[in-house]
Swiss-Prot record:
One of its GO terms (molecular function) is heptose-1-phosphate adenylyltransferase activity. The lineage of its organism: Bacteria, Pseudomonadati, Pseudomonadota, Alphaproteobacteria, Hyphomicrobiales. One of its GO terms (biological process) is ADP-L-glycero-beta-D-manno-heptose biosynthetic process. Residues 1-330 are annotated as: Ribokinase. It holds the Pfam family PfkB. This is Bifunctional protein HldE. The keyword Nucleus does not apply. Pathway: Nucleotide-sugar biosynthesis; ADP-L-glycero-beta-D-manno-heptose biosynthesis; ADP-L-glycero-beta-D-manno-heptose from D-glycero-beta-D-manno-heptose 7-phosphate: step 1/4; Nucleotide-sugar biosynthesis; ADP-L-glycero-beta-D-manno-heptose biosynthesis; ADP-L-glycero-beta-D-manno-heptose from D-glycero-beta-D-manno-heptose 7-phosphate: step 3/4. ATP binds at N205, R206, K207, E208. PROSITE patterns: PFKB_KINASES_1. Homodimer. GO terms for cellular component: cytosol. It comes from Rhodopseudomonas palustris (strain BisB5). The keyword Kinase applies.
Length: 490
């Protein structure tokens, strides 16, 4: 078992108490192709829309998605947006919501209008009251929070300055948590870090850090110097400054700064990436990891989150694929077990703008001819899926004496190759059904076929894809190898 798997097992046993500003995130996707005749403003032709639990609610969703349990305390209004949020959170089996309703304020709601094609935000509309909660609501929040501290392994305060985390709530929660020996992570919004006094870790982004410290924060040394004064003011153990494409820097009260560069990734949407960082930091630290491990996990999770549209969560499988070197992934990670899993991987790759390739075969006894085709196929794409004939399919095509190796053994051999990203077993005589599902950008076969003989060529061509024929190596075929083995010749 890898260290990552051991960490995931520990995460599954942790509970995070998350408190913060809950909001409803709505995304309206469309395109602009004309200007309104009524006023000089663009007209968005809406194509689709979606809703997500946002703000501190997205932090809670990320905590649950990575495998931990989350007790979540937030504030909603007595309105449709609040009821929608309650229903959405109730669907999350690993989140225990304790929502306080304040009829005097609306539920925070943000509607973003986004270009479907370019993934750029064109407009945002907000419904909110950012004033602090009343003393009555403060008390109801504390009545919900304080009894849960004993159950939590770590506390996470997600401050969006929408009224939940008042100074009274912050001070009361941190003091109570410290008495119980619980660590507190704060994702701050206030430029006055002193109100978070006693927290274990503050996680401002660069803009928030500059505003609070009045420093340039252009280098690790700049951040380290300014953070020491800020930590003294906030009486915290460490400060982590996130810097988007420049990575993240952790400055401990005692010890050397740790900087983790950002992972290269095609950014589609940065909405909620900070939520993901805070959530992963909390669960990994609660699971017993050190600062450096927690930072690497958070950085990898952020890279996954920004490659998705909307307010996104990160799963353990996505985190594993981002953290572990490609060649280190276990064979079972590359062998697809269901159509739903295949669809999930494809969606993930396409969100990242990756070119997907496909080839297929029986691969009964892997030989240099196979390796040449697979290597060429991988060179023509960013991710290669290999369609593998099932045992029953091979018998129909090759006869009752085949395959020599069963489908699981053949799949594991293929999955061990660095050129192969996924192996999908199909039971039909041809991979046509699989190709229709994948719709690859490039379809690869050996040069002993003509373009018209390649199954699925018309599907790929219709989508503007490429059919690639690779010259075969003479003298290599599984059939001839089997015959030679039976004859005892080489």
């Amino acid at each position: 078992m890898s260290r990552f798997d051991t960490l995931l097992q520990s995460i599954a046993r942790t509970t995070v108490l998350c408190v913060g500003d809950l909001m409803l995130d709505e995304f309206v996707y469309g395109e602009v192709s004309r200007i309104s005749p009524e006023a000089p403003t663009p007209v968005i032709a809406v194509q689709r829309s979606e809703i997500n639990v946002g703000g501190a609610g997205n932090v809670a969703r990320n905590i649950a998605a990575i495998g931990a349990r989350c007790i979540f305390v937030g504030l909603i209004g007595d309105d449709e947006a609040g009821r929608t949020l309650s229903a959405e959170i109730a669907r999350e089996s690993r989140i225990e919501p304790l929502l306080v309703c304040d009829p005097a304020r609306p539920t925070t709601r943000k509607v973003r209008f986004v270009s479907e094609h370019f993934s750029t935000h064109m407009l945002r509309a907000d419904w909110e009251t950012a004033s602090a909660a009343s003393s009555e609501i403060e008390q109801r929040l504390l009545d919900a929070i304080l009894p849960q501290l004993q159950r939590a392994d770590i506390v996470l305060l997600s401050d969006y300055a929408k009224g939940v985390l008042t100074e009274r709530v912050i001070v009361s929660v941190i003091e109570a948590a410290r008495k119980l020996g619980k660590r507190v992570i704060v994702d701050p919004k206030s430029a006055n870090f002193a109100i978070y006094r006693g927290a274990t870790l503050l996680t401002p982004n660069r803009k928030e850090f500059v505003s609070a410290t009045r420093s340039a924060a252009e280098t690790v040394d700049d951040i380290a110097a300014a953070a020491q004064d800020a930590m003294a003011l906030a009486d915290c153990e460490a400060m982590l400054v996130t810097q988007s494409e420049h990575g993240m820097t952790l400055v401990p009260r005692v010890g050397e700064p740790i900087h983790v560069p950002a992972m290269p990734v095609k950014v589609r949407d940065v909405s909620g990436a900070g939520d993901t960082v805070a959530a992963v930091l909390a669960v990994v630290l609660a699971a017993g990891a050190d600062w450096a491990t927690a930072m690497r996990a958070a950085s990898a999770a952020a890279a996954v989150a920004v490659s998705k549209n909307g307010t996104a969560v990160v799963t353990p499988a996505e985190l594993r694929r981002k953290i572990l070197p490609h060649a280190s992934l276990a064979a079972e990670e590359k062998i697809i077990g269901s159509e739903a899993e295949l669809d999930l991987r494809l969606a993930e790759w396409r969100r990242e703008g990756l070119r997907v390739g496909f080839t297929n075969g029986c691969f009964d006894i892997l030989h240099p001819g196979h390796v040449k085709v697979l290597t060429a196929a991988r060179g023509a794409c960013d991710r290669l899926i290999v369609g593998l004939n099932s045992d029953a399919s091979v018998r129909r095509l090759k006869g009752e004496s085949r395959p020599v190796q069963n489908e699981r053994a053949r799949a594991e051999v293929l999955a061990a190759l660095e050129a192969v990203d996924l192996v999908a077993i199909f039971g039909e005589d041809t991979p046509l059904k699989l190709i229709k599902r994948i719709v690859p950008s490039v379809l690869v076969k050996g040069g002993d076929y003509t373009r018209e003989q390649v199954v699925g060529h018309e599907i790929v061509a219709a989508r503007g894809g490429e059919v690639l024929l690779v010259d075969v190596l003479p003298g290599f075929s599984t059939t001839s190898l089997v015959e030679k083995a039976r004859e005892g010749t080489t």
